[in-house]
Amino acid sequence: MGAKITVKEYTQLEGHKQGVYALLNLRGSSVIVSAGGDGAVVKWDLDENGPVRMNPEPSVAGVLFAQLPEPVFCLMEGLDGVIWAGTQGGLVFKLVSGEAPRMIKLGTSSVFFISRWMDGRIAVGLGSGELVFLDDELQLLDRKSLGTKSLRCCLGDMGLVGGSDGLIWRLDAQGRLLSFWKANSPSVFCLAEDAQGDIVSGGRDALLMWMGEDGGLKQEVKAHLFTIHALAGSELGWLASGSMDKTVKVWDRNNGALLKVIDREKYPSRGHSHSVNALCWVGRLLASAGDDKIIRIWEVSV
């Protein structure tokens, strides 16, 4: 069993007109970035006016960073404050404050992830099963067919890609395939790293799987009732999972023990009412967002 934790309602962020699909914490800051079905890319500073509490009303105002022409499925922080965004229609945008958005069209299938690869390139996963590599100037460097179905998630610094073939692929720094193995069935939707460097995956089968670097299964947990959409690891030793079953769960990143369930039963007025699609940590604060259009912030403590 892991150490007991306490989860308190901190605040909620409202303004998106459709479901939220992506969250990002900007490095070394209290700022999170959100994006979703309305195409809006929004910045929220959780520490702008000091600690924010639920009572009486949400008091963090979002700042529109960019309005894109179609739903945004993924975000990545680039160099020097640049934000990268991938869309439903195969567009990758490079967003720089004070400048017009730049973009490259990679096809017509959705962009499900953008990740910094081991060699510094930018890896992009497409619904077509293609893995695309770009440089920081949006120049196309390479593209290859990896899966027969969508590529859904990536740990770029480890060379790992998961997808709707139910597989995890391991590639080298140059993008050459080293190995692959079966994981969540039929689809792997999210990947994370635990405290020991093992791989954690979640997917349509609602299972959390802990695997070694070679794909050997170490632990398997029926973590949720429905599809697991998101995983987020904390430097403080926690792993959060978010699911179509409307719950967020917090696990011990060291041993996989379940520490807390966040749902409408325990938090009647603040738990998610629809699918949870995205998660990110800001220190002890956990941000969760989904189809109810609201970003909910939770304070986690021991």
List each model region and its residues.
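WD40-repeat beta-propellers
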Residues: 41-45, 93-95, 134, 169-171, ...
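WD40/WD-repeat beta-propeller blade N-cap
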Residues: 13-20, 56-72, 105-111, 144-151, ...
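Intrinsically disordered, low-complexity acidic/Ser/Thr/Pro-rich linker and tail segments
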Residues: 1-22, 30-31, 37-42, 47-73, ...
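Hydrophobic core register within WD40 beta-propeller blades
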Residues: 23, 75, 114-115, 153-154, ...
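A structural motif specific to WD40 beta-propellers
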Residues: 8-10, 52-53, 101-102, 141-142, ...
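Conserved strand-to-loop turn within each blade of WD40 beta-propeller repeats
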Residues: 35-38, 86-89, 125-128, 162-165, ...
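Blade-level signature of beta-propeller repeat domains, shared across WD40, Kelch, NHL, RCC1
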Residues: 275-302
